[in-house]
Amino acid sequence: MAENNARSPRLLVTLTALFAALCGLYLLIGGVWLVAIGGSWYYPIAGLVMLVVAGLLWRSKRAALWLYAALLLATMIWGVWEVGFDFWALTPRSDILVFFGIWLILPFVWHRLVVPSSGAVAALVVALLISGGILTWAGFNDPQEINGTLRADATPAATSSSIADEDWPAYGRNQEGQRYSPLKQITADNVHQLKEAWVFRTGDLKQPNDPGEITNEVTPIKVGDTLYLCTAHQRLFALDAASGKEKWHFDPQLKTDSSFQHVTCRGVSYHEAKADTASPEVIADCPRRIILPVNDGRLFAVNAETGKLCETFANKGVLNLQTNMPDTTPGLYEPTSPPIITDKTIVIAGSVTDNFSTRETSGVIRGFDVNSGKLMWAFDPGAKDPNAIPADEHAFTFNSPNSWAPAAYDAKLDLVYLPMGVTTPDIWGGNRTPEQERYASSILALNATTGKLAWSYQTVHHDLWDMDLLAQPTLADITVDGTTVPVIYAPAKTGNIFVLDRRNGELVVPAPEKPVPQGAAKGDYVAKTQPFSDLTFRPKKDLSGADMWGATMFDQLVCRVMFHQLRYEGIFTPPSEQGTLVFPGNLGMFEWGGISVDPDRQVAIANPMALPFVSKLIPRGPGNPMEPPKDAKGTGTEAGIQPQYGVPFGVTLNPFLSPFGLPCKQPAWGYISALDLKTNEIVWKKRIGTPRDSMPFPMPVPVPFNMGMPMLGGPISTAGNVLFIAATADNYLRAYNMSNGEKLWQGRLPAGGQATPMTYEVNGKQYVVVSAGGHGSFGTKMGDYIVAYALPDDAK
């Protein structure tokens, strides 16, 4: 018995020393590797110290606590020197060390260190208190936040559209893409009382043949007393706006397969026929119609009252968008965003499969008669004559740059503004023609009636990073030097917001050309300069090893090693066989959610992201042929291995993640922010989102850690001084004070909310509605919910 009692204390000391030794060996070996490739000396030094601590513990010497206290304090000093008082950046540098330090001061542990050393326990306690104090201070003083207050003054802006205040009749409420509502029943003072008003379930869930990239991104529209929305499979629903009850639904019978790169519908468009532009037959058949784009290349016109097809439109209500396409394989051309509707024209473009081959279908933009569906014009960005209409023997151009995001429209100028993508394959461009380069990654302004080019502005030259313009542009009239200027705001993946006079494409906010890294892959080249807007959320400095992150110092070390193994010289570092760190990453700092602009206050709300990706070019060889095998289809995703058939390299595209699946760049990965559009200053910026729904295990209670999470979807703003946003990787709809960014309310969603909300009023009550259906590749919970919130009847 005495022998067993003696073994027990010794076993505890042995296990403690063994843990310290394993930590030390890991840090020493990994740290030497890191230093050899140009990284920090901290890790091998910390590893050596931990090995000495382990030796002292093995010998039961309390001097180990002195040395460990010194290591802990040195680590905190080093951490603050590297990243400042940033809680989330300090956490992986300190968490294991702090927990192990707490273990060492437990009485049943240090009492077993029988060789005394004066003050050792007290020294470690002091070191832990100092470390805890630093972390506590950092937790309440976020260096990434900007804490200002927007101006409250407002001047009613002129409007070119006659939209009833209570309606939301287009994707961005108006076709200017402002995502702003003049409603103010819900205010910053009462939004905390918001309650769930109704929930509608569409019944549209992931099917066995669907790709991983099935997403629920719809923003419903509301006209009169009816909501109109589409589901992931483009089923169209009309709901009573007050109760959420179904009025009718229409199913286009979309047949998908796993090669589709997208299965999604961001919204539908509305048109009311007018006697001066529509025949009596059209008005009798479909006086009010919903225009529904479908991922297999069809466009439907549906009677807004009955849900029946409009017989006088195209082929009994169905328009074939695959006509004259160079490749009509379903899924290669996918209209995923609602078209622009003018009094005369439907203007529609579509998504083209990224990174598949050099023989993909065209990204042509077309204008169709809104009443008959007849082709009025075409603009093929990759053709020598973009406006040439194909004959029966002639098709549109292979691999023309496409425009997949929602467009914007100025009715006064009759100009439609299209955010353009890059010619695919995206990550190698040595074979692109001048025509394919001409309008790629540009803002394109076309006459909506004729399709003729008004102007274009290119935001990335010879794009090798898939830095397409992916957000709906926003139109507003802004005061510049005392003069009102009609401008267009074009948020870009790079974090730049390009601001141009929408009449002529001239820059309103400077965007000087600056040199960028050189050295393209074999057979390619890199543009010598790129435009950098003065209005930007671009990172203020390039990433370094200090910006690497992890759950612990161990996976943080792995991320630092991976970082130094990649090619990275800042933004626009060219793709490489070595592997290139792409930051801002492929999701972009801005994505399809766009920004919200209050035209009266002349302020904007934005939700930028900061998530690096890694691209790696794969030379042709066994298993990586130049030409596609027979019957080859798309991969069904934009990430992972992409074949890029027809060019010298395939490519892999992935988020830059740690071994635990966490981003290797330290948080925040997502922000909510406000801009003063008169001064072009960022007034406030806050982290948004918690890891609650990204944890490796279910969390029964909310996780109060506001890390700043990745997101997909945009904000809306209201005259009630409230902004609403879902979008984040946790399942919440949130409300913020527009003036200062204070979070006022959040509502738990039943599934992922990767969609932009909307708001409207019916029967005297204001509602806020969001789609909660999840996002396949984003990894959020899938569902089929449309959720509405409103104030209770007795709210004050």
Where in the sequence are the language-model features?
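Topology signature of small-to-medium multi-pass alpha-helical membrane proteins
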Residues: M1-T149
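Hydrophobic or amphipathic alpha-helical targeting/insertion segments
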Residues: F99-V114, G119-P143, L239-E246, T264-H271, ...
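N-terminal pre-domain segments of enzymes
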Residues: G133-L183, Q530-R538, L543-F554, K633-E638
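Mature N-terminal segment immediately following signal peptide/propeptide cleavage
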Residues: P156-L205, P220, S673-L675
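Repeat-blade elements of multi-bladed beta-propeller folds
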Residues: W168-G172, E213-H233, F260-R298, G331-T358, ...
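Short, solvent-exposed loop/turn elements at domain surfaces
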Residues: Q175-S181, D204-D210, F237, D426-I427, ...
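Extracytoplasmic/lumenal domain signature
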Residues: H192-L205, L236-S258, H271-D276, I283, ...
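Segments forming glycine/polar-rich beta-alpha architectures that bind adenosine-containing cofactors
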Residues: R502, P574-P575, T580-P612, L617-P619
